[in-house]
Swiss-Prot record:
Family (UniProt): Belongs to the universal ribosomal protein uL29 family.
Signal peptide: none
HAMAP family: Ribosomal_uL29
Keywords: Ribonucleoprotein, Ribosomal protein
Name recorded for this polypeptide: Large ribosomal subunit protein uL29
One term of GO molecular function: structural constituent of ribosome
Organism (species): Synechococcus sp. (strain WH7803)
One GO process term, biological-process aspect: translation
Lineage: Bacteria, Bacillati, Cyanobacteriota, Cyanophyceae, Synechococcales
Annotated Gene Ontology cellular component terms: cytosolic large ribosomal subunit
InterPro entries with a match to the protein in the record: Ribosomal_protein_uL29, Ribosomal_uL29, Ribosomal_uL29_sf
Length: 69
């Protein structure tokens, strides 16, 4: 799973960003559950998911602050 550039994320619509954020939060929940039950094989997915979630949240906040001003 390659990390997308910020410019690629900025091209997404607000609905797509929200959908991906919700999907990543669900994925992180599932990964934590798998880790707790010792079923998780690739622990690097935690880092990848957290980074992508942070990037999406940053783009979302940028849009909110630009529309508020």
């Amino acid at each position: 799973m390659a990390r997308p550039n910020a410019s690629e994320l900025r091209q997404l619509s607000d609905a797509d960003i929200t959908e991906q954020i919700n999907g990543l939060r669900r994925e992180l929940f599932d990964l934590r559950f798998q880790q707790a039950t010792r079923q998780l094989g690739n622990t690097h997915r935690f880092k990848q998911s957290r980074i992508k979630l942070a990037q999406l949240l940053t783009v979302q906040k940028e849009r909110q602050s630009s529309t508020a001003s």
